C-alpha cells in the first residue's frame, strides 16, 4: 500500500488532495513562499490527525502543519530543497472549541479560529488574547500560539500558553503524544484523545494549575522604554514553551488559554504629525506614566494610507459590510476561480484580483472626512485606543501635549474608529494586490522589523543605492511595542533577495544586533542613525 492509499484509509478520499492545481493554495503562502507536497491532508477529528501523523512518521515524510495559512512569512507552507517528500496536514476541519471554568479559559483545537472564539465569548462579555488584525483573515488560535503571534493588544502581549496537548518526535525518532493540558484524560493516546473529543470531564471544574495560559509578564516588558532589546520578536527564548513559539516543530492538537473581560468602554484617539519624534514622545510618556496601558497603538505612514485606500478598498468593504465570518469561504472561492481560469487562454493571471480592483473603483471613497483631512495635512498617524480610566488619562495628556507640539489629534467616533482600524489591517495585503495587478512584473520585499524599546529615532531612512530600487515603501505597524511592518514594492527588474542582502548589510552597519527570521521577516535590535 502506498502513502496516499494509507492516508485515504485514515481520512477518506475527499480529505486528501494530490492534484497540484487543487493543492496550490495550501502550498503557497499568503504573501510569499511556495513548495511541493505529495499531498494535502484534512483530518476531521483529533484521532484522525493522530493517525495521519503516525502514517507520515512511519513513512519518513516531512510533516508541514498548517491551519488557516494566513502566515505572512511562509511558515505554514512547504519550502523548496527538501531531501525527502513532504505532506501538508491542514487542521481547519477540526473546528471545535470548549469553554471551561465558565468561560474564563478555553480549549482550542487546530481549526478553531479567532473569529469563532470571539463569537463564542461575546455573550459572556469576554475576549480572546487577540481580537484585531489577523482575525480579519480567519487566522487560527493554535497558529497564533505556534508563532507567538499578536501583541497588538498591548495589555495582553503575544499569544502564549504553557498548557497544551501535542505530538513530538524524540531524538530516537519515536513519536509521542504529550498531555500537558492540566486535565486528567487517561494514559494512552487513544484514551486522551477520545476523552478530550467527547468532553468526558467537567468543563466547569477544570483544576487550576501553576502553569500560565497567557503571557504573564508583558506589561513589565512593554513599559521598559529604556531597554536596548526588542519587546517582542519571533523565537524569543522567553516565549518558547512546548507548543508556544514552536513554529510547527511539534504538532499541536489542543491548547488551553486564558480569556479576558471585555472592556465596557473604549475610545480611539486619532493622532497626526509630520514629526515622528512626537509619536515616540507620546509612546514614552504613556508607557512610563499612565496607570492604564492602552488597548492598542497602531501606526500608519502617509504612503501606506494612500495605497491602502486604493488597493485595499474592496477588502475594507467586504469586512465592513459582510464581516469576517465568510472570509475563508470567499478565499476558497477566489482560489477556485484562479485555478479554473488559469486553463482559459483568454484570461490573464490573477483575473479575480483585477476584477475586484476594477469593481472597487465603482464604489465611492470609504474613508471618513476627518481621516482624509489628516492624510492631507500629516505624514504619520497613530491610532491610540484606550479603555476605562485610561480614556481620561489620554484625553488630558494629549490636550496638554498638543498645545505645544506641531501635530494634532481628535477623538474618533464609532464609524471613524471602525474604518481606521480596518483600513490599517487591510494594508497587509496592499503589496500583494499591487504585484498581482502588475502580473508579477515587479517583486515585493515584505519585512517585519522589531526595534529596540529605547530606539528613539525609529523611522527608517534608507541609503540612496537602496532607495533607488524601491517604487513604494509601505510603513505600518505597532508603534507602542516598536514592531514595524515594512513592505517594499520594488521597481521592475529588481531582485528581492539581492535587495534583502543589501538591506541586511546596511542594517548591520547601524545596529547592535540582527536576527534574521527563518523565512522573510527580519527582527532587529536597532539604533538608527
Give the ranges of each region predicted by the language model.
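N-terminal flexible segment immediately upstream of the FAD-binding catalytic core
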Residues: 1-54, 58, 71-105, 257, ...
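Conserved glycine-rich FAD pyrophosphate-binding loop
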Residues: 31-32, 36-38, 61, 73-83, ...
Amino acid at each position: 500500500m502506498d502513502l496516499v492509499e494509507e492516508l485515504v484509509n485514515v481520512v477518506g478520499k475527499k480529505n486528501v488532495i494530490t492534484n497540484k492545481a487543487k493543492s496550490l493554495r495550501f502550498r503557497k503562502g499568503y504573501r510569499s513562499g511556495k513548495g511541493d507536497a505529495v499531498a494535502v491532508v484534512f483530518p476531521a477529528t483529533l484521532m484522525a490527525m493522530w493517525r495521519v501523523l503516525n502514517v507520515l512518521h512511519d513513512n519518513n515524510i516531512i510533516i508541514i502543519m498548517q491551519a488557516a495559512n494566513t502566515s505572512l512569512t511562509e511558515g505554514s507552507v512547504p519550502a523548496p530543497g527538501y531531501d525527502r517528500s513532504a505532506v501538508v496536514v491542514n487542521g481547519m476541519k477540526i473546528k471545535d472549541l470548549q469553554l471551561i471554568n465558565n468561560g474564563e479559559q478555553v480549549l482550542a483545537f487546530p481549526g478553531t479560529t479567532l473569529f469563532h472564539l470571539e463569537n463564542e465569548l461575546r455573550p459572556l462579555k469576554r475576549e480572546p488574547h487577540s481580537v484585531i488584525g489577523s482575525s480579519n483573515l480567519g487566522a487560527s488560535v493554535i497558529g497564533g500560539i505556534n508563532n507567538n503571534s499578536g501583541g497588538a493588544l498591548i495589555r495582553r502581549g503575544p499569544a502564549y500558553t504553557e498548557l497544551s496537548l501535542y505530538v513530538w518526535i524524540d531524538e530516537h525518532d519515536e513519536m509521542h503524544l504529550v498531555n500537558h493540558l492540566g486535565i486528567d484524560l487517561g494514559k494512552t493516546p487513544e484514551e486522551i484523545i477520545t476523552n478530550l473529543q467527547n468532553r468526558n470531564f467537567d468543563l466547569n471544574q477544570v483544576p487550576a494549575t501553576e502553569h500560565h495560559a497567557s503571557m504573564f509578564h508583558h506589561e513589565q516588558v512593554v513599559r521598559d522604554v529604556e531597554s536596548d532589546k526588542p519587546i517582542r520578536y519571533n523565537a524569543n527564548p522567553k516565549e518558547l514553551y512546548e507548543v508556544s513559539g514552536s513554529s510547527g516543530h511539534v504538532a499541536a492538537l489542543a491548547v488551553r488559554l486564558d480569556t479576558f473581560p471585555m472592556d465596557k468602554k473604549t475610545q480611539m484617539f486619532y493622532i497626526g504629525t509630520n514629526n515622528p519624534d512626537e509619536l515616540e514622545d507620546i509612546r514614552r510618556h504613556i508607557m512610563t506614566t499612565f496607570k492604564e496601558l492602552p488597548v492598542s497603538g497602531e501606526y500608519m505612514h502617509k504612503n501606506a494610507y494612500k495605497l491602502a485606500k486604493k488597493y485595499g478598498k474592496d477588502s475594507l468593504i467586504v469586512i465592513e459590510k459582510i464581516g469576517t465570518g465568510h472570509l475563508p469561504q470567499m478565499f476558497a472561492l477566489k482560489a477556485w476561480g484562479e485555478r479554473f481560469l488559469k486553463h482559459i487562454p483568454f484570461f490573464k493571471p490573477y483575473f479575480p484580483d483585477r476584477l475586484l480592483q476594477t469593481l472597487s473603483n465603482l464604489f465611492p471613497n470609504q474613508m471618513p472626512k476627518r481621516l482624509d483631512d489628516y492624510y492631507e495635512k500629516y505624514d504619520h498617524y497613530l491610532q491610540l485606543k484606550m479603555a476605562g480610566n485610561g480614556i481620561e488619562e489620554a484625553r488630558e495628556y494629549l490636550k496638554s501635549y498638543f498645545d505645544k507640539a506641531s501635530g494634532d489629534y481628535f477623538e474618533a467616533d464609532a464609524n471613524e474608529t471602525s474604518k481606521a482600524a480596518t483600513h490599517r489591517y487591510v494594508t497587509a495585503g496592499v503589496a500583494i494586490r499591487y504585484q498581482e495587478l502588475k502580473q508579477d512584473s515587479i517583486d515585493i520585499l515584505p519585512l517585519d522589523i522589531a526595534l529596540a524599546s529605547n530606539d528613539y529615532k525609529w523611522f527608517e531612512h534608507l541609503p540612496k543605492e537602496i532607495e533607488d530600487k524601491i517604487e513604494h515603501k509601505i510603513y505600518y505597524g505597532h508603534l507602542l511595542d516598536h514592531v514595524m511592518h515594512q513592505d517594499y514594492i520594488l521597481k521592475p527588474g529588481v531582485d528581492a533577495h539581492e535587495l534583502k542582502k543589501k538591506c541586511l548589510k546596511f542594517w548591520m552597519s547601524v545596529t547592535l544586533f540582527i536576527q534574521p527570521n527563518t523565512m522573510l521577516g527580519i527582527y532587529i535590535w536597532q539604533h538608527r542613525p
